[in-house]
Amino acid sequence: MNIRPEEVSSIIKKEIDNYKKSLEIKTSGTVLEVGDGIARIFGLSNVMSGELLEFPHGVMGMALNLEEDNVGAVILGNASLIKEGDEVRATGKVVSVPAGEDLLGRVINALGDPIDGKGEIHVDKYMPIERKASGIIARQPVSEPLQTGIKSIDGMVPIGRGQRELIIGDRQTGKTAIAIDTIINQKGQDVKCIYVAIGQKRSTVAQIYKKLSDLGCMDYTIIVAATASEAAPLQYMAPYSGVAIGEYFMEKGEHVLIIYDDLSKHAVAYREMSLLLRRPPGREAYPGDVFYLHSRLLERAAKLSDELGGGSITALPIIETQAGDVSAYIPTNVISITDGQIFLESQLFNSGFRPAINAGISVSRVGGAAQIKAMKQVASKVKLELAQYTELLTFAQFGSDLDKATKAQLERGHRIMEILKQPQYHPFAVERQVVSFYIVINGHLDDIEVSKVRRFEKELLDYLKANTNILTEIADKKALDKDLEEKLKESIANFKKSFN
């Protein structure tokens, strides 16, 4: 075999021409100590706060404490694989999560990896978990209603798209139930729902997933789960990951409902991380920036201006109180950040009044502007009568000889309380709620026994649906005009004749 010298030289020339010199500079450091999910790293001189770090064995971390001679980082994975002396590389990227339509119907962890065994998720975009909230000019006031399907809420503490409404109460008072019912009620409303489970039991998350799947609600829902068995950094990240995914849809002009269940456990996870990072503790051993932790998260809920597509994120954070103590540190923080709160009482829950919402101390500071006219017409009277009833009930315990008017008011109050009761997973359409409130405040239930009120309500609504177009008219007009009211009165009178 003859090798010609010119052939060899042409190959060498070609290789020299194709050679591209590239220099990749990577910032790296060394692990000084590791333990409790925290690593102290020497080096990494140009690292950013919140930057993603690469440890050996594919384990990732996040830089949080940038100190004079070392970096404190939290480990987002199996910390037992990391040892002293390991090399750590800075990636130059902040922590981001995948966002896209493919996430709908899936259960993911705080890093955006699927944990439901349904295979990979293919997305076109990554969203940073920490991001500045929309500015003042970019927003518009809350004006569209977000119907929860729960009579007590839609009537007395209405929620609008772009609002932050806190759900607060002791454990086992039905906080999550309200959130899940709200997700169920968004079916067909073109609202994407994100349920963020922070520090929940795995069995609880599985139960919620099954219920939403059975009812066909996972088609528009994403579950972000950082369960109790996961490390504090992942529980800390979960709500930010959830809202980052929500922002992807909001920027496309869509409406999003996000539930944080619950922020008490989120604050505990952050406290654990902060203490391990040697940050100075404050009240109840929480770090000084625990208010900012929740304010920067909840400020990302917004109703964008029409120029920016008019999308919205509505946030329903949940807070668990201890023995009804609303004046504790975290509850007062979140109450002051949000636009109102729905207060659940164990006393009401145990007495069989469910959902156990105390309408007297529950408020919605901006939702009133978003209520439909028909609901405003009937619900304002309900709230007033309920407040008077609660007051009279206290007096009635002491005095036995009550006058006729007081007795009548108490009887009306009993019927209002009965109308407000609602089984779980049975959200009410807004037009049905309007009729329910209308019959109770206009005295159509005064001659019906309290024990038969709910049966009367159900059968009347079925009768109206089958024999009239009143419900459709309320839904279309969104108001109760004189003609419609006359029709409704007539139908109620006709139905009463056949009700036994």
UniProtKB/Swiss-Prot annotation:
Alphabetical list of InterPro entries matching this protein: ATP_synth_asu-like_sf (IPR023366), ATP_synth_asu_C (IPR000793), ATP_synth_asu_C_sf (IPR038376), ATP_synth_F1_a_nt-bd_dom (IPR033732), ATP_synth_F1_asu (IPR005294), ATPase_a/bsu_AS (IPR020003), ATPase_F1/V1/A1_a/bsu_N (IPR004100), ATPase_F1/V1/A1_a/bsu_N_sf (IPR036121)
Pfam (any one): ATP-synt_ab_N
Any one GO molecular-function label of the UniProt entry: ATP binding
One GO CC term on file: plasma membrane
E.C. no: 7.1.2.2
Site (Required for activity): S362
Record's keyword annotation contains Nucleotide-binding: yes
GO biological process, one term: proton motive force-driven ATP synthesis
Chief location: membrane
Catalytic activity of the protein: ATP + H2O + 4 H(+)(in) = ADP + phosphate + 5 H(+)(out)
Enzyme class: translocase
Family statement drawn from the similarity comment of this UniProt entry: Belongs to the ATPase alpha/beta chains family.
Entry function: Produces ATP from ADP in the presence of a proton gradient across the membrane. The alpha chain is a regulatory subunit.
Subunit structure, interactors included: F-type ATPases have 2 components, CF(1) - the catalytic core - and CF(0) - the membrane proton channel. CF(1) has five subunits: alpha(3), beta(3), gamma(1), delta(1), epsilon(1). CF(0) has three main subunits: a(1), b(2) and c(9-12). The alpha and beta chains form an alternating ring which encloses part of the gamma chain. CF(1) is attached to CF(0) by a central stalk formed by the gamma and epsilon chains, while a peripheral stalk is formed by the delta and b chains.
Descriptive protein name: ATP synthase subunit alpha
Species annotation: Fusobacterium nucleatum subsp. nucleatum (strain ATCC 25586 / DSM 15643 / BCRC 10681 / CIP 101130 / JCM 8532 / KCTC 2640 / LMG 13131 / VPI 4355)
Gene name of this polypeptide: atpA
